[in-house]
Amino acid sequence: MNLVIWDIESSSANTDFGSIIEIGGILVDENFKEKDRFNLRCRLPEGEIPQAMALIVNKTSIDQLTKVNLSHYQMLGEVEKKFKKWSPAIFLGWSNIGFDDEMIRKEFFKSIRYPYITNTTPNKRHDGLNIAR
């Protein structure tokens, strides 16, 4: 089964109030040979105020939040297409069960997309932090 290693950067540490502003992923086969990759960045959704500490942590400038061509909705559409294309796979990240999965579920739900794409049949998920523990 293929493995998707993915991560997000967000406008807040709170999954209820923040938005994904950047997401990237790498698709590898069972021998860890890279098959595909993507990295997308979008504008901050209109009316949202980013958390200053989140921007410091993910090294995002105000220009990056406002002058990118891709809208937040368009970015989520591209992510959905990519994840569907890469399925079936095991989705893996670092601390992603506690944060990234929650964030993408909420974002997909708000944009009327299927929110459980990373962990329902035929896909599975795992967390690198849990492996390390």
Positions of PLM-derived features:
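Short alpha-helix plus adjacent loop in nuclease-associated cores
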Residues: 123-133
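Substrate-recognition/cap helix-loop segment adjacent to the acidic, metal-dependent catalytic center
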Residues: 99-124
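Conserved non-catalytic scaffold segment of RNase H-like nuclease domains
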Residues: 1-107
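Short, well-ordered alpha-helical segments in soluble proteins
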Residues: 83, 108-112, 132
